[in-house]
């Protein structure tokens, strides 16, 4: 008889938590970053990005596309549990050489945001404390691919 209250509690419906969306935002990816951590606040090492992608895969996270997010917002289909939107800002050249191959390998969708005036231009700008030129950013051909 003492088990009855416990059994009744276990029989109560559990309120489902609506799927949420986590957003991971990246800027630059470098092949090598000295030390055990990434001291450049705007960059992650290629090795750490692989470790993060592996963590997502091995721990039940589901990278989603912008179309998935819009469809969920419009009520057409829900997001999966543990939805993650991967974003890469500023259109750094490393997106093409380091990130894009990893996205294909893991079969992960992603969003890339570019500053079009930085692409194939003569502009020299300061970015993350360094002078940057157009070669540091994606080209139009790379973006089309």
Give the ranges of each region predicted by the language model.
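Short intrinsically disordered, low-complexity coil segments enriched in acidic
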Residues: 2-3, 145
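Sec-dependent N-terminal signal peptides
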Residues: 3-14
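Active-site beta->alpha N-cap acidic-glycine motif
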Residues: 18-21, 33-145
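Short polar catalytic/cofactor-binding loops
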Residues: 26-31
């Amino acid at each position: 008889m003492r088990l009855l209250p416990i059994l009744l509690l276990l029989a109560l419906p559990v309120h489902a938590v609506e799927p949420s969306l986590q957003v991971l935002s990246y800027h630059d990816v470098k092949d090598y970053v000295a030390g055990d951590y990434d001291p450049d606040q705007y960059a992650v090492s290629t090795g750490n990005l692989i470790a993060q992608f592996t963590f997502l895969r091995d721990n039940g996270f589901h990278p989603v596309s912008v179309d998935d997010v819009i469809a969920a917002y419009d009520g057409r289909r829900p997001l999966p549990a543990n939805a993650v939107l991967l974003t890469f800002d500023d259109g750094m050249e490393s997106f093409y050489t380091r990130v894009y191959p990893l996205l294909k390998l893991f079969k992960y969708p992603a969003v890339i945001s570019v500053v079009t005036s930085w692409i194939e231009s003569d502009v020299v700008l300061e970015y993350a404390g360094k002078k940057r030129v157009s070669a540091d950013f994606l080209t139009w051909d790379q973006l089309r691919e």
